[in-house]
UniProtKB/Swiss-Prot annotation:
This is Peptide TRP-J1. The lineage of its organism: Eukaryota, Metazoa, Chordata, Craniata, Vertebrata. One of its GO terms (cellular component) is extracellular region. Expressed by the skin glands. The keyword Secreted applies. Keywords: Amidation, Secreted. The modification Valine amide is found at V10. It is found in: Secreted.
Length: 10
């Protein structure tokens, strides 16, 4: 799972 590895918008 590479969902948390993506740059999340802050």
């Amino acid at each position: 799972l590479m969902y948390y590895t993506l740059p999340r918008p802050v």
